[in-house]
């Protein structure tokens, strides 16, 4: 998906404000912050709760009670006792030593999503950070000051230590912010905005970096965009059904609502019915049966006809395939939204309770569902590529010319070449194995089972991006299938809107031309949600 850049020094007036309270952050709100530059604030209740948690925590420390990461070393070095007089040095050293991420930087929208996820986890009020820490992260988001976060370095337990350390570095005036996609020293950026670096107190370095906010913030964006991608797949599937004069029968409500009531299947079937409503090209199954009966010759025991009562799976199993994707996304969304509103560092502090030394930083729940999302999105891409092949292969396309060539086949190749990147990307998607079972012990075997959750989220993002190109080729081919069959006039309102949206971007393929630009153009439009908007402008409310 296309990444978004937020201008420094300004807050978007178009996106609804987001209040961080540790309880109600959802994927839509993360996207408003990450992509839309929504104004951010921490609720007064969360600030008060943070202050109370801090007071409880300081009472514990002042009573001489040992606390991990406050009066001890970190990780495997927990056996080392550290005098409280070293509070700032201990926290600062942790941030510096763990700012060890490598590789490409997260784009600005993804980095903002990660900051938002960390802010909300701390806003839960059990992490014992001062309210000033929460307010500083919210200020960064409002000013468009986005930490430069390398993508590689997290094991997913103890949370996303390395990525989050790069955020914490900017809080203390070290590390880098992004400017135009490039890193700029944080101390310089803070001076330009009249901000002083914060001095970390007991536990604050640990609280900032010890959590699942990398995988959760990125996962929230992937899931939000994944929901859009499944709708985009439904839209182009409907257009292809029209182009090959498919049947409405497989999408009738009884077969889904009554017979097999998986929520995703029901929703995809409903969307296909809405998208095909008003089409003069689709046929009813009852009419097909009549055609078969009329074609039967008396006295023949076996007879070949050109009438297909059912078309191939790729043209009638969309409710089952894309509905399965929907159900996967729904499960993953529920788990990620729970994690967005969780205190996922260690230790945690509760009024009148024992200090909780645990492992809420472990990203296994998120890692599992991001792997599940990768599987589901991979199958979405497979369906799209098989539908594409169906209209390009003259033996399978129900009368359409080979490779949708508008002129002379052989002299012209049509979409023969454009199919290759789609097929290659399917193969690439299939090479991505589960990350959530790839635990490798680290940290002196203290971290002896880890989740690799951020790798799982990055894998899902990779498939999402690959699918954008697969769908782009399918949208182009679907529009050309309408052209070569001269079926535009019979399209449904949604079909015409989809076709028109494609043709507003690229002209008809009447002769071979340089194809890469067409694919990139349509892929970018998919990233902007233009085809969903075109359909919704026809008063179609997609589920």
What role is predicted for each listed range?
Residues 30-41, 108-139, 208, 212-215, ...:
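N-terminal glycine-rich flavin-associated loop
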Residues 135-142, 162-165, 169, 231:
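A broadly conserved amphipathic alpha-helix scaffold signal in soluble, globular proteins
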């Amino acid at each position: 998906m296309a990444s978004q850049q937020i201008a420094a020094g300004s807050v978007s007036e178009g996106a609804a404000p987001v209040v961080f309270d540790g309880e109600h952050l959802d994927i839509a709100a993360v996207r408003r912050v990450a992509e839309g530059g929504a104004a951010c604030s921490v609720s007064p209740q969360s600030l008060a709760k943070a202050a109370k948690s801090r007071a409880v925590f300081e009472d514990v420390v002042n009573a001489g009670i040992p606390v991990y990461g406050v009066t001890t070393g970190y990780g495997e070095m927990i056996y080392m006792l550290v005098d409280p007089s070293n509070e700032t040095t201990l926290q600062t050293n942790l941030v510096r030593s763990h700012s060890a991420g490598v590789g490409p930087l997260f784009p600005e929208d993804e980095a903002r999503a990660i900051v938002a996820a960390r802010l909300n986890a701390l806003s839960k009020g059990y992490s014992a950070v001062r309210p000033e820490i929460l307010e500083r992260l919210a200020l960064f988001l409002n000013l468009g000051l986005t930490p430069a976060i390398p993508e590689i370095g997290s094991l997913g337990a103890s949370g996303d230590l390395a990525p989050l350390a790069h955020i914490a570095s900017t809080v203390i005036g070290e590390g880098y912010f992004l400017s135009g996609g490039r890193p700029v020293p944080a101390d310089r950026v803070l001076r330009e905005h009249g901000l002083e670096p914060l001095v970390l107190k007991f536990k604050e370095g640990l609280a900032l970096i010890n959590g699942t906010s990398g995988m959760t913030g990125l996962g929230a964006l992937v899931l939000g965009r994944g929901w859009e991608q499944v709708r985009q797949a439904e839209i182009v599937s409907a257009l292809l059904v029209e182009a090959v004069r498919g049947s409405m029968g497989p999408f009738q409500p009884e077969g889904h609502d009554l017979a097999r009531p998986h929520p995703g299947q029901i929703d995809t079937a409903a969307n296909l019915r809405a998208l095909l409503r008003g089409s003069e090209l689709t046929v009813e199954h009852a009419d097909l049966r009549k055609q078969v009966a009329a074609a039967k010759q008396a006295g023949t025991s076996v007879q070949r006809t050109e009438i297909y009562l059912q078309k191939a799976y790729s043209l009638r199993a969309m409710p089952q395939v894309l509905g399965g994707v929907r159900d996967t996304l729904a499960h993953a969304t529920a788990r990620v939204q729970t994690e967005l509103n969780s205190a996922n560092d260690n230790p945690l502090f509760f009024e009148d309770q024992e200090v909780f030394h645990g492992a809420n930083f472990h990203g296994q729940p998120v890692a599992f569902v991001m792997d599940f999302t990768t599987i589901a999105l991979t199958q979405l891409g497979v369906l799209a590529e098989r539908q594409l092949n169906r209209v390009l292969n003259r033996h399978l396309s129900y009368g359409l010319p080979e490779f949708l060539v508008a002129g002379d086949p052989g002299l012209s190749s049509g979409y023969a070449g454009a199919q290759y990147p789609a097929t290659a990307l399917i193969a690439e998607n299939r090479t991505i194995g589960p990350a959530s079972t790839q635990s490798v012990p680290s940290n002196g075997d203290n971290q002896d089972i880890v989740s690799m959750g951020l790798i799982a989220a990055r894998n899902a993002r990779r498939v999402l991006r690959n699918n954008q190109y697969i769908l782009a080729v399918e949208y182009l081919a679907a529009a050309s299938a309408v052209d070569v069959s001269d079926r535009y006039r019979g399209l449904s309102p949604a079909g015409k809107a989809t076709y028109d949206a494609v043709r507003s971007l690229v002209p008809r393929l009447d002769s071979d031309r340089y194809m890469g630009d067409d694919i990139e153009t349509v892929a970018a439009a998919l990233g902007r949600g233009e085809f969903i908007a075109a359909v919704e402008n026809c008063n179609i409310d997609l589920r």
